[in-house]
């Protein structure tokens, strides 16, 4: 039986290689073994997002933000997931927080501004 760490490493490698569906399988198994590490949940959220499974991605990024409320990347990805679900008004807050935490990130500002415009 593979350890949580081995599953996480394999899932992360698959994610980086672009095999999002295979990454999901490994990362979900890792999360089942240990649901606490935000690194596992963030990687799983990324894989789900790239596989266009936005509702599941949203749930993973939300779990990361609950544990690490200043994780700018998780906030950004939560906002992007909400945007992909058409929930633009809800996306405004996490995208605005991400942009405040990392003002040098132009992509954060771009999507924050899009959410503001779309929800207005």
Regions found by a protein language model. Name each.
Residues 2-33:
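Alpha-helical segment of the N-proximal tetratricopeptide repeat
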Residues 59-84:
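Mid-chain, well-packed structural core segment of small domains
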Residues 1-4, 92-120:
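Terminal, low-structured helical/coil segments at or just beyond the last alpha-helical repeat
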């Amino acid at each position: 039986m593979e350890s949580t760490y081995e599953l996480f490493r394999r899932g992360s490698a698959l994610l980086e290689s672009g095999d999002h569906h295979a990454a999901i399988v490994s990362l979900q198994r890792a999360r089942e073994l240990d649901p606490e590490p935000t690194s596992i949940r963030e990687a799983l959220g990324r894989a789900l997002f790239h596989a266009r499974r936005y509702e599941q991605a949203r749930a993973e990024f939300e779990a990361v933000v609950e544990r690490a409320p200043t994780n700018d990347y998780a906030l950004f990805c939560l906002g992007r997931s909400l945007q992909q679900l058409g929930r633009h008004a809800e996306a405004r807050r996490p995208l605005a927080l991400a942009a405040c935490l990392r003002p040098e990130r132009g992509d954060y500002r771009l999507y924050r501004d899009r959410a503001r415009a779309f929800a207005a």
